[in-house]
Structures are given as structure tokens and as C-alpha cells.
């Protein structure tokens, strides 16, 4: 009989047993559940609600169960319905009456909310670590390619030349903001629901602050209804994950393009490529494509929980059983994606010649030629028109701006002098972008220093995340 079966004369229908069980999913939170139960029992003993002997038996019994699960020696029974019932029933089987006292002053409603919050903290921390590792890889690549120039694009058309290091640092800053969002998700989960019981609190003299401190929470949730009924902290994790997936997808798209025959900017290592079953010549960027594809999966998990939550009245509803699978899937998916992305970048080969060659087409110097005229007194809009006419002439002749004779420039505007060649020189164009955040080598060096400082600060934040109940892997 189920632990809640006293009020019932018959068991649940066979067809609903598996349908209603959450154990296949929430068993992955076994460490969080056991840690929460230990803290609850310790508080019950401190408050004189259970004896010290019972608390010791409970703690030892739970430790034994955890060790068995860690070692893969624990059999989960679907009839136990969820991780809470599974562990409590096994605890009672092992230690007897003391196990039946564990649930005093507690409901599965505040218990599962606690497990989930502890789980979100653990998942956010894992993702933060993977985020830091990828940013290290991007930083190393930015240092390595700090003099390599490639075309910058708008609308996927040649725009202006930029340093490859500048391009890579753009993604580093995106992932730095992702770290901040992950920390915000961690903080959103960092309050303890235990003591809220089913929804209204309890008549037992529980010390909620003690339990929260034991579990490493920053504090307690001040409203018992809110404590058991909302999952906005999970949505914060989903949103942070969705933005990470979007940034990874954008970077993956560029890797797919850059590794193509049409671009040839990079060559992916064999370890991060696949072949074709029919075309012997193929070397496909499958893993970049998979990262791009998995972004939709991560977005779907966010939307699923939003839709699940949108119509729920206070307080707990069984719909909330659907809250964990998507979060676990998103975290697992992103951990893989972040790791694969770091591997791809750290092992690729940059084809500097192909990037330099592509800088010689597409009239990348056009803006600087217009600026040349504007700095000599011609209104920029007029300068823009003059250079636009020169570009049109180049298109008709099948040449680039730097191929035009000096006489053609003078015919277009008497303001052109022989030093126009400097405005047509790609390295000089890049070196001129000295504004803060610009692509000039000097500006990028400053930016790199700031990025390294931000990375170091985020590593300090990560190092401060103590007393986190790490995810267990014995239930896989």
C-alpha cells in the first residue's frame, strides 16, 4: 500500500501506476532528497520533535541508501511513485519505526520544492563551470589570432575588415552575460521551502532558518503558499539556458559557414567532423550543426514549463510533476554543447590566407574612402555618394577599389590625393578603429584585458558557491 493509502479502500488502476509516477525522472535528485531529509531530521531532533537516537538512525540509514545508489546497488520500484516515497519506504524497511517519524512536519510539496531548488543550484553551477571553460578557450584563441584579419559582415555581405580576435571576443562577452544569467538563476533558487508543509505551514515548532542553513540556502521563502506552488526559479534556469543555446547556435552557424568550401576560413579537426556514407570527399561539420539544432530542444523545454505554469491556481497541483524533466534535459544538453564547442575551437585550424584573400574583395575599404573625403571637408552624405559611384564603376569593370587608377579617383572628386592608398590598405583600416571597443589591435588588447578581468571575477564568483549539493549519477 502507498504511504498515503490510509484514506483509500482500493489501489490505483494499473494503467495509472506508470502514468502517475515521477520516479524515472526525479530519481536523479536522490542526493538532494537525501540531503534535505537529513537536514529536516536534524532540525526535528534539535527542536525536540524526535529523539536524538531516531535522528541518528535516520541519518545513518539515509547515508547507507545514498551509498547504495551511488554504487548502482539500489533498485528503484515504480510502485513507490516518486523519489521521496522510494527513499522513505526503503529507510523504514532498514531502520523501522524511526523511519516513519522522518516525515513529521513535512509534506511532499515542500520536500519536492526543496529538492528541485537544490537541483537547480547544482545544475546552474555545472553550467557556470562549463561556461568558464569555453570562455578560456575563446580567450586563448583571441590571443593566438590577434593579428589575423577577416571580413566583417552585415546581411552576410562584406562590410568592413576586423581582427579575428575581435570577432571571437564578441562571443566571449555574450557568454560572460550568460554566466551572469546562470548566477541569477542560482540566486533565484537559493531560498528554502522546507517548513511550508503542504501549503499553510505546520503546527510543529520547526526552525526553518536552521534547516535552510544546513542545506546551504541563503534564507527561507517567507510565504508558505509561494514556497510550494511556484517554479519561476526553474524558468530562470530555462531562460538562461535558452540564451546560451542561442549564442551557441549563432557561433555554430559561423563555424558551418567558415568551414565550407565557399569560405574556407577554418578547417575542423577530424575529431570534430564526420564523413558521408556515399560521398568519399565529404568532411561535415555535423557537431556544429547538432549544437545549432539542439537550440530548438532547449527553447521547447522553456515553453513547455511556461505553458504548464500559466493556468495553475495556488497552491500545489500535480501538473508541477512535469517541471523537472525539461530542466534536466536542458542542463544535460547544454553541458554537452558547451564541451563540444570548446573542443571544436581549441582544435580547429585557421586558414589565415583564405581570410586575407577574402578581404581583397567586396570593397571593404569603401567606408574609409568615404571617411577620407569627409575628413577633407566634404559632407559625409556627399562622400558616400561619390564612393558609391566608384563602387558601381568597379562592379562594372570587375575590379576592386584599390585597382582603380588614381586618375579615376581624382575625376570623382578633386579632394582625392595620392595618399588615398592608405585608406585602401586593409591593415591600416583595421588599425584606425581605435575607439573603445573597436577592432584596432591596440583597442582589442585593452578589450582582451577587460575580458580576462571579467573572467577572473566570474571565477571568483564560481569559487564562492559552496555547500551546493552536487548532482548524483548513481541513478542513471
Report residues per predicted region.
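Short amphipathic alpha-helical segments with heptad-repeat character
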Residues: 117, 121-128, 132, 139, ...
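Conserved hydrophobic residue
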Residues: 50, 74, 263-264, 379, ...
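A short small-residue
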Residues: 41-44, 111-119, 154-156, 224-232, ...
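A helix-coil-helix interface module used to build multimeric assemblies
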Residues: 1-201, 206-213, 274-275, 286, ...
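Conserved helix-loop functional segments at active or binding sites
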Residues: 144-147, 181-184, 188, 217-221, ...
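Acidic, glycine-rich loop-and-beta core segments that form the ion-binding/anion-interacting portion
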Residues: 214-307
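Glycine-rich cofactor/substrate-binding loops
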Residues: 1-32, 36, 97-98, 279-476
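Generic, well-ordered alpha-helical scaffold segments in large soluble proteins
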Residues: 40, 61-68, 90, 94, ...
Amino acid at each position: 500500500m502507498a504511504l498515503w493509502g490510509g484514506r483509500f479502500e482500493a489501489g490505483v488502476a494499473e494503467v495509472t501506476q506508470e502514468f502517475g509516477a515521477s520516479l524515472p525522472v526525479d530519481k536523479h535528485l536522490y542526493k538532494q532528497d537525501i540531503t534535505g531529509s537529513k537536514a529536516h531530521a536534524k532540525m526535528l531532533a534539535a527542536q525536540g520533535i524526535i529523539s536524538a537516537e531516531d535522528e541518528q538512525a535516520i541519518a545513518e540509514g539515509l547515508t547507507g541508501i545514498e551509498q547504495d545508489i551511488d554504487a548502482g546497488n539500489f533498485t528503484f520500484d515504480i510502485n513507490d511513485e516518486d523519489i521521496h516515497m522510494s527513499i522513505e519506504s526503503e529507510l523504514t524497511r532498514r531502520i523501522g519505526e524511526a523511519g516513519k517519524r522522518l516525515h513529521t512536519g513535512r509534506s511532499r510539496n515542500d520536500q519536492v520544492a526543496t529538492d528541485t531548488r537544490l537541483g537547480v543550484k547544482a545544475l546552474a553551477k555545472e553550467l557556470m563551470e562549463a561556461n568558464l571553460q569555453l570562455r578560456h578557450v575563446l580567450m586563448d584563441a583571441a590571443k593566438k589570432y590577434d593579428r589575423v584579419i577577416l571580413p566583417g559582415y552585415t546581411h552576410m555581405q562584406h562590410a568592413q575588415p576586423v581582427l579575428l580576435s575581435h570577432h571571437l571576443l564578441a562571443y566571449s562577452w555574450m557568454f560572460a552575460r550568460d554566466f551572469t544569467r546562470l548566477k541569477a538563476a542560482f540566486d533565484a533558487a537559493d531560498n528554502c521551502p522546507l517548513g511550508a508543509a503542504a501549503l499553510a505551514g505546520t503546527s510543529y515548532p520547526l526552525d526553518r532558518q536552521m534547516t535552510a542553513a544546513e542545506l546551504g540556502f541563503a534564507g527561507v521563502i517567507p510565504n508558505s503558499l509561494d514556497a510550494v506552488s511556484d517554479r519561476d526559479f526553474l524558468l530562470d534556469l530555462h531562460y538562461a539556458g535558452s540564451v546560451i543555446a542561442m549564442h551557441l547556435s549563432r557561433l555554430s552557424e559561423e563555424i558551418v559557414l567558415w568551414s565550407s568550401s565557399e569560405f574556407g576560413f577554418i578547417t575542423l579537426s577530424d575529431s570534430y567532423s564526420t564523413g558521408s556514407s556515399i560521398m568519399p570527399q565529404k568532411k561535415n561539420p555535423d557537431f556544429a550543426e547538432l549544437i545549432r539544432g539542439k537550440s530548438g530542444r532547449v527553447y521547447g523545454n522553456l515553453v513547455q514549463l511556461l505553458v504548464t505554469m500559466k493556468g495553475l491556481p495556488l497552491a500545489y497541483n500535480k501538473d508541477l510533476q512535469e517541471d523537472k524533466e525539461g530542466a534536466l534535459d536542458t542542463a544535460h544538453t547544454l553541458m554537452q554543447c558547451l564541451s563540444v564547442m570548446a573542443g571544436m575551437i581549441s582544435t580547429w585550424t585557421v586558414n589565415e590566407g583564405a581570410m586575407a584573400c577574402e578581404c581583397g574583395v567586396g570593397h571593404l575599404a569603401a567606408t574609409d574612402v568615404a571617411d577620407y573625403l569627409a575628413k577633407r571637408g566634404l559632407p559625409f552624405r556627399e562622400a558616400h555618394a561619390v564612393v558609391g559611384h566608384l563602387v558601381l564603376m568597379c562592379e562594372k569593370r570587375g575590379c576592386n577599389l584599390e585597382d582603380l587608377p588614381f586618375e579615376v579617383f581624382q575625376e570623382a572628386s578633386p579632394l582625392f590625393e595620392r595618399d588615398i592608398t592608405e585608406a585602401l590598405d586593409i591593415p591600416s583600416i583595421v588599425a584606425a578603429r581605435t575607439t573603445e571597443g573597436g577592432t584596432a589591435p591596440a583597442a582589442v588588447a585593452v578589450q582582451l584585458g577587460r575580458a580576462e578581468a571579467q573572467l577572473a571575477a566570474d571565477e571568483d564568483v564560481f569559487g564562492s558557491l559552496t555547500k551546493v549539493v552536487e548532482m548524483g549519477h548513481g541513478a542513471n
